[in-house]
Amino acid sequence: MLGSSPYFKRLSVGLYCPYEGLSDLVVSLKLLYALKYIYNAKVIVFGSKVNESLARAIEFIDEYVELSYDIKYEKDKRKNRDIINEFMLDYIIPLRAGNKSINFLKSTNAKFIIIRTKEELEYSSRFIFVNFENNKKLQQSNEFLRVLYRARSINSALFDKEISKLSFDIDIQTKKKHKEKIDNFFKNINNPLNSILISPFAKETKYNLRLKDYIKFIKEARTKYPYLNFIVLTNEKTHENFLEHIDKIDEKLLKSIYIFKNDGDILNICELLKRVKCLIAPSSGTMYLATILKINSIGLYSLHDTVYWESFNKNYVLLEKIKDGLSKTDIQNAIGMLLFKLAEFLRK
């Protein structure tokens, strides 16, 4: 029953993810949704500046608190600990379960810490371990589901009763400024609905093509589909790198494609994704965001990631080797398969 729960005491539950990656918060959204609509919990996210705008656009996150990720200094640990302790949490859930993070969270006043880890940890009665090894369904499920099931540790009977009632329609509401920014970007583009977004950059995976391979793909795709608009997503750190590559390979191509340089606000990417026909990207934060938003995509994935990071429409070009290990033949095959998948998608 959405919005209410037979669980009478209002719980206070925190997600600990003060990391710099977009994927950390995105992969946790179904977990946070369940915490709100199964337990009617007060949901607090302790995160980084990177994810702030996204978190504040999601109605089932009650509070977003920025923490310092670098806690090697005692004063930073104390500051983070004091911030967390203010919330008197019933549960805290670290997204990553390294020894340093767990030991830090043990020093807070959170009653219980829900973790999944194979690290050797000093026993604490406050630990609640999530064991996937005895659950065949979860062993073979995607990471969104595996993170979601950490919520089951709070009250398994209630979770099992209510989980099938949840729709997981996660709407990320962008603001007027984001809509206007994307409106302005598309102002000089003919037929914006015929746009393909390409996001070539990824910190999360080694399974990817090189920039020059993406440029070769774009060049061939432009020739085959001149009516399509190809948009490349960059940011402050990657923009110049992309321009240098395209300038070396084919400077004329720059005049026939579009580049959206994001300013760091994730909600710009959300609004852009909602406007395009399809996303082409490796297994990355942008792809996971498209999955949550139910946007069609073609993913450059390892076989492992097709299981653990499956996309909305499960449409992949498989890469059997990491980027640095790809031969010329491997790259040609991947580009050929991308073109085939794009043609297949456009026929539907």
Where are these regions (language model features)?
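Catalytic machinery of carbohydrate-active enzymes
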Residues: M1-K348
